[in-house]
Amino acid sequence: MEIPYVRQPIRLPARYAHGPDSFVQPGVPQGALHEYDWNESRVFPGTRRRYWVYVPVQYRASEPATLMVFQDAEWYMNIDFEVRAPVVFDNLIHKEEMPVTIGVFVEPSENRNAEYDAFDDAYATFLLEEIIPAVRAEYAVTDDSDRWAIAGGSSGGNCAFTAAWFRPDRFRRVFCSSGSFVQMPAGNPYPALIRETPPKPLRIFLHAATRDLNHNSPENNWLSANLQVAAALAERGYDFRLIVGDGEHDGNHGGVLLPDAFRWLWRTEPIGDE
């Protein structure tokens, strides 16, 4: 595939323009978002949050749908923000460039960093034992792990990565934009851990930014941490893709990339195949 020439910016940071799949298109049916409250958690006692379920027009209860879970619900589902996942779902499902998918957008509690930056299976367990069963009680979702994905940006990005790392039996496809790996309490465990551990059955889309937080610092460098994770994935032969942009620690470039990320994550080749 030949990519058209695009003049690169001289002054940074840069902002990126959204493509047509990030805008509401005439003639494309729009899915619905349904809001729910979750006020009694066993995994995170005393916390409260909301979550939303996106249901595409093409959904049929007789045909179990693919599942994709997003952290930081508002950042990902608000079509006036940068990411606009529901609009991208509408356009790509309509064109059959991704499967019919139930999207679950979960708010963090007031303990966002404690939940998202932890290096354990607690958040994955919260999703798998609390939120997702509630969703599946109302909507037909496939039990095929190859059709379950998880996504997030910033701390929500490393949260998504960690959930898939601990539970690859459930989450197989990962979207991680500007992951805050440096905020994990004991430091970023993944570069060493990925190299030391047999490869897991994961397909991972990573986005990093050259002007991310502390990009020119030897410590707590978001860009460096994401590149180190990507390098380890490459060395172990993972089914992964890395896109590096010239933006900052915001949702702009990651949001612009979302349609291409979805197309790549949901391509039909078995996980592990390029």
Question: Could you tell me what each predicted segment is?
Answer:
Residues 1-274:
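Non-catalytic cap/lid and distal C-terminal segments of serine-dependent acyl enzymes
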